[in-house]
Amino acid sequence: PSYPVRVEIHVRSHRESDTFLQWAVVRNEGKEGIRLHRAASAQLGLRTERYFVTSFRGTWGGESLMSEEEVARGHELALVSGTGTRTAQEGSPGFIISLDGPAREDSGEVILGALAWPGNYRIWFRHSPYHYLFAGAGLDTAPAPYLLDGGGVFETPPLILTHSKNGKGEA
């Protein structure tokens, strides 16, 4: 089906902190409501041989336990939270992508990202057979699709990004 929808991609840079924000605005230009089943704030495309993703998971009394894993070629890794407003306890919507090797404190190329959203989210990392990494982040509306009324506007939460060629300590 075809819907009268306009999607705007917004990017804002903050030179003083070397960060970027990216988000999307969805405009329903029709008269009827539509359901949004997924709404990504941002997507990235990278190319190198190996990718490692660091995430921060946990539970009460053991929050923000750091774990790092390689995204194998042809595979996808997803960080998902469907706990609503308990997201901060179960896992952070933040990540580190390390290129060509595990993340190091003071060397190596890394991208840090955090979705500025306290509710359900989905962050995914797909390593293609051709050595591209496609990554995206956004709120997860799968448990309850968002109804965007006719003439309505929906703004996704921003994904905050920064990059360093000198390890995660500099980023």
Predicted regions and their residues:
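Acidic/glycine-rich phosphate/pyrophosphate-binding loops and surrounding catalytic core
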Residues: 113, 117, 161-171
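Short beta-strand and strand-turn-strand segments in soluble, beta-rich domains
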Residues: 135-139
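Generic detection of long, well-ordered alpha-helical segments
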Residues: 14-17, 33, 150, 165-169
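Short Pro-Gly-centered flexible turn/kink motifs
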Residues: 146-164
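Short helix/loop capping segments that flank catalytic or ligand/cofactor-binding pockets
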Residues: 34-35, 123, 156-157, 164-165
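Polysaccharide-binding surfaces and accessory modules of carbohydrate-active proteins
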Residues: 1-126, 132, 142-144
